[in-house]
Each structure stands twice: as structure tokens, then as C-alpha cells.
Amino acid sequence: MTPPRKLHIKSYGCQMNVYDAQRMVDTLGAEGFVETAEAGDADLVILNTCHIREKASEKVYSELGRLRVAKEEAARQGRAMQIAVAGCVAQAEGAEIVTRAPTVDVVVGPQSYHHLPELLARAGRGEPAIETEFPAEDKFGFLARPSREAIRARGVSAFVTVQEGCDKFCTFCVVPYTRGSEMSRPVARILDEVTRLTENGVREITLIGQNVNAYHGEAPDGSTWTLGRLLYGIAEIPGVARIRYSTSHPNDVDDSLIAAHRDLASVMPFVHLPVQSGSDRILGLMNRKHGASDYRKVVDRFRAARPDIAFSSDFIVGFPGETEEDFRATLALIAQIGYAAAYSFKYSPRPGTPAADMQEMVSATEMDERLERLQSLIDSQQAAFNKAAIGTVVDVLFERAARKPGQLVGRTAYLQPAHVMAPDNIIGQVLPVRIDSLERYSLLGELVATAAPVAGAATPLVSIGG
């Protein structure tokens, strides 16, 4: 019997890359591959790359240097190792990757993962195996479905891609060039995927897309569903305890999405809503097509519909031309909104984007200083948000065993990790926890009540405490 070939995938960047990596594993599993945690043991290594920031791209080439050594060692052992570069760096740089790193066998963009078996066969015959086109067919219709065993092994939370690409063309962003124009998956395929996940133990669904709330998918009756309408449809599927979505653009928040937050307890009151800057002038240079006041109005609409809602965001400091006054406007917006969490970055020029050609670059020293000030404000807000949980009872979805024996870790509605001493038969349940203290960014508490263990793949979740 021929032993299975071993596959190692290393993903960089966004949640969609995590999802894409899982789908590549599923597709290659049908070709006889099994995963291995060690790149050096693999017959195929895939780097699933991110192109959002310069450092992410350079990390890929550093990793390829290490893999070249591993590939040479495998050859000395009489074993052939193939190396593939996938993701947004592959899409952006294409054949240049092979020129710069000849050890690479396959280069495949995000829209062509269903062609991986064919590309690997081509590379095995010594033929060029580079595909970075945007094929006409929908890759999701060709990628293999995960096995029941794979779903169960991945845990109680799962990502589901509903939308890809972006038509916003923010001047700093490469996504429209690496992921293409906006494309929404058909409603039926999404509902089928979610149903299969919940039938195999998944309790939390996170819908993902580069601009997820631009979703406009075709329903079986020919109508078009928005993201808000899709949330209602998913909420009706037995076993779905929690629904999240990411990442959103303020301009695409419509009434149906607000209504879903108002009406559906399963839609979590935590929204990642990037704004990037609080300066109208900088937002204009970024081509965000909204101002700071527009963003505040969107936040107000969410809060009016769901008073317990909280927000996270993205911020870029040091965008070309950013003055101290512009930066202070960002700090003012952060102070006005009050965030549960946020991600802050120094501006990194990406080749081919309009911002890369802008003048008036902010110095590295100023960027560092501004990032420190911004992050300090964000950290203080996050600490206050977490501290406010002490003494309250919060619902926690228990996900897995923690490092400490006898302890489980789960997530609150706001994605805060919560650690509780509890039996592992409650994994997959949402249970009330009284929060007693904090440990760095984690909440510590004790169960208020217990419930019957989830007994079987399709058993609906037992939820206590609303």
C-alpha cells in the first residue's frame, strides 16, 4: 500500500487565508495528502501568503530560503519535496516569485485553488505551474468539501467565506488587485455549508469576506440577499448558537444589517468596523468615500438597535501627508467611539497602489511615536472594557481545554478569552460564567450553571442564561 503524501500549509494574514488553507487541505486530502505539523517532513509545503504589508511579503521570501535548505535535505534522503506559494503574494508577483526563489514549484493565486492538483502534476512533469488569472468559474463549486472528521477536528467555531474581492479601491490597499472585484457566493451553497458544519459540532459561524457587508448573493428563488438577510437565514439553521461577520466597510452598513443585530440573539453584538483615520482630509486621500461624522452615525445606528454592542477597528498611522492635527483627529475619534479592541499599523506602501506614489512621507520616527500614542489609548480602552466585566455574568462558548489542567477556555460575545475550571463535556456549549478577575487580556471566572453535554453531531445547542 502506498503511504499517504504529507502536506504542510503555513498561512499568513487574514481570516480568509485560514479558511482558504482549510479548503486546500480538503481538496488535497482527496488526492491522498495528509497534514503534518513539520515542514521538513512534508512532500508538499504551501505558503499561503498575505500582501497587505511589506513585512508580510518579505517574511515569505525568508521562509522560502529556509525551505530551500529543507528541500535539498529531502533530496539527499531520496525524497522529492514540492513547494507552492499561494495567496495574495502569489497573485501580485506571479512568475517573479520563481525568478527570485527558483526552489518554488507552483505559484497559485487565491481564485485558482481548485486547480492545485493539476498544477502539482504539471510541476511534477517539469512544466511551468503558475496560475494567477481570475478564472470565470466559481472556485467554491470545485473545491472538495471537508470530511466530517476534519470538521470535528477543527473545533466548535468555523469560518465561512461568503464574499471575496473589493471594489472600494482605497489608495493604500492591494486587495482589489490581488483578490479581484467583489463576488458573492450563492445563498444555497452558503446555507448548505453552514448546515454541514453544524451537523458536525460547529456552534459558531463567522462569515468572512474582504468587504463582507457588500454581500449580494443570489437566492434559490432568483432574488438577491444582502448580508442582513443572510444572517436571518443562517439563524434558522439548527445548531447555530453564534453568528459573526468580518470585515465590514462603513458605507455598506444597510438597514437589514442593523435589523439583524436588533432581532437576532445569535448575531453577536461585536462588530469589526475599520475606519483607518479620524481625519476627513486623510480619509479623502485614502479614498474611503466617507468622513469621520459618517462613521460616527453608523456606530450610532448600531447602538440604537443593540445597546450592548461593542466595536473593534483598524487604524493606519503615518499615511502620506498626515499631520499632527490629522493624527489628533484620529485620537479624538477613538476617544468618542470607545473601542473594545483595535488593530493599529504604521503605513506601509504597497507597489501598484496610488498611495505608494504620494509625496510628503511621514518619517519613521514620527510613525513610531504616533503608533505608541494611539496604541496606548486603545490599550487603555480595552483594559477598561475588560475590567467592566468583573462581577458580571457573561455567556461563554466553551471551545477547548486550556493549558492549565482541568481548565477550559471559551469566548464571550466580544471575543474575550474566558478561562474556567470545568469538565470538558461542556465544550461546544454556551454557558453563563461569573467573571471574578482578569489575567492580562483574559477573563477568569466560574460557571453559574451547567447543562447536559452536547450528545451527537446534530444535537441543538443547549444555552442557559440567554
Curated annotation (Swiss-Prot):
Enzyme class: transferase
Residue stretches making up the MTTase N-terminal domain: 5-125
GO molecular function, one term: N6-isopentenyladenosine methylthiotransferase activity
Gene3D superfamilies, per database record: Methylthiotransferase, N-terminal domain, tm_1862 like domain
UniProt domain Radical SAM core: residue ranges: 152-384
EC number: 2.8.4.3
InterPro entries documented for this protein: Elp3/MiaA/NifB-like_rSAM, Methylthiotransferase, Methylthiotransferase_CS, Methylthiotransferase_N, Methylthiotransferase_N_sf, MiaB_methiolase, rSAM, rSAM_horseshoe
Record text on cofactor binding: Binds 2 [4Fe-4S] clusters. One cluster is coordinated with 3 cysteines and an exchangeable S-adenosyl-L-methionine.
Residues of the TRAM domain: 387-449
Keyword annotations from UniProtKB, A to Z: 4Fe-4S, Cytoplasm, Iron, Iron-sulfur, Metal-binding, S-adenosyl-L-methionine, Transferase, tRNA processing
Predominant location category: cytoplasm
Cleaved signal peptide residues: none
CDD domains assigned to the protein according to its UniProt record, in alphabetical order: Radical_SAM
UniProt binding sites for [4Fe-4S] cluster 1: 14, 50, 88
One Gene Ontology cellular component: cytosol
Taxonomy, superkingdom: Bacteria
SUPFAM superfamilies given in the database record: Radical SAM enzymes
Cellular location(s): Cytoplasm
Binding site for [4Fe-4S] cluster 2: 166, 170, 173
Catalytic reaction(s) noted: N(6)-dimethylallyladenosine(37) in tRNA + (sulfur carrier)-SH + AH2 + 2 S-adenosyl-L-methionine = 2-methylsulfanyl-N(6)-dimethylallyladenosine(37) in tRNA + (sulfur carrier)-H + 5'-deoxyadenosine + L-methionine + A + S-adenosyl-L-homocysteine + 2 H(+)
Record family assignment: Belongs to the methylthiotransferase family. MiaB subfamily.
Purpose of the protein: Catalyzes the methylthiolation of N6-(dimethylallyl)adenosine (i(6)A), leading to the formation of 2-methylthio-N6-(dimethylallyl)adenosine (ms(2)i(6)A) at position 37 in tRNAs that read codons beginning with uridine.
Oligomer status and interactors: Monomer.
PANTHER family assigned to the protein according to its UniProt record, in alphabetical order: CDK5 REGULATORY SUBUNIT-ASSOCIATED PROTEIN 1 (PTHR43020), MITOCHONDRIAL TRNA METHYLTHIOTRANSFERASE CDK5RAP1 (PTHR43020:SF2)
The name this protein goes by in its record: tRNA-2-methylthio-N(6)-dimethylallyladenosine synthase
Origin organism lineage: Bacteria, Pseudomonadati, Pseudomonadota, Alphaproteobacteria, Hyphomicrobiales
Name of the gene this protein is made from: miaB
